[in-house]
Amino acid sequence: MKITVLTGGSSEERDVAFASAVQIVGGLRERGHQVAVVDTVTGVLSPEEERGVLKGSVGTTPPSTRELVARERAFLLSGLGALREVQEADVLFLALHGGRGEDGTIQALLDTIGVPYTGSRSLGSALAMDKDVSKRLFRDAGVPTAPWLMAPVSAGDVTKELGWPVVVKPSKQGSTVGLTVVKRPEDLEAAVWYASEFDDEVMIEQFIPGRELTVGILEGQALPVGEIIPKHEIFDYECKYTQGMSEEIFPADVSESVAAESGRLSVISHRVLKLGGYSRVDFRLTPNGGLSV
């Protein structure tokens, strides 16, 4: 097959996208597919450019990519659909993280062009990227999720509604970009300002202590539950992408009931968000055995 991998992009997760593309491109070529690689900011990558950016490693902090946003917008509007590598591809494999690559923008553009692509459609991508909307849908579907408020909100309201500590984060970001665990009311304002650098909406969520579990979904079926043990208090950007900063255990050492319930809730979450193909649902397993998406 002729497969074009879309990667890079202008979000703070640009390096993460390249790291994903390393595995995808290598795996596809090993299986005999004809693979082209397109950065949604710069266009088709030559073999030399591939070697330069597809390194498989990610820095300990997300890169500043604001200067790339306008370039990506211009390329998507005028260049992507005109590329031979896009027009002649049997399918586009999306290796994009954050920003337009995950929020439904590129998916909607590809629907307009009429090119098949992997992953969820534009609506599912948009729903899953927006944490506030996702949590509202989870709540309505009976999926347990931590209580939350949306900024602006006073420290007094947070004390009354959520208690401390809380997690302050951009509503539409991934990889814990812009996230802070806030333990004192006097630190709330700074955390909200920091999160607002990455999104125009900021969520303040009750901190749920416990173990970090994750369940993959493939074609509507839950895969075995795994556990992630980070070196830090939370599974932050550094722990996600720095070798040795976290331990991943598959399958997780949990009871049969926890494994079954996490799988059940993952399938519900996948369906509620109208996702397609594959997804991943992360949980906190509390000391008393409760699960929270």
Label for each model-derived stretch:
Residues 1-123, 127-129, 133, 137-140, ...:
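ATP-binding N-terminal substructure of ATP-dependent carboxylate-amine bond-forming enzymes
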Residues 1, 7-10, 139-142, 255-293:
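ATP-dependent carboxylate activation and anion-phosphoryl transfer catalytic cores
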Residues 118, 146-147, 223, 235, ...:
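A short, local hydrophobic-aromatic micro-motif
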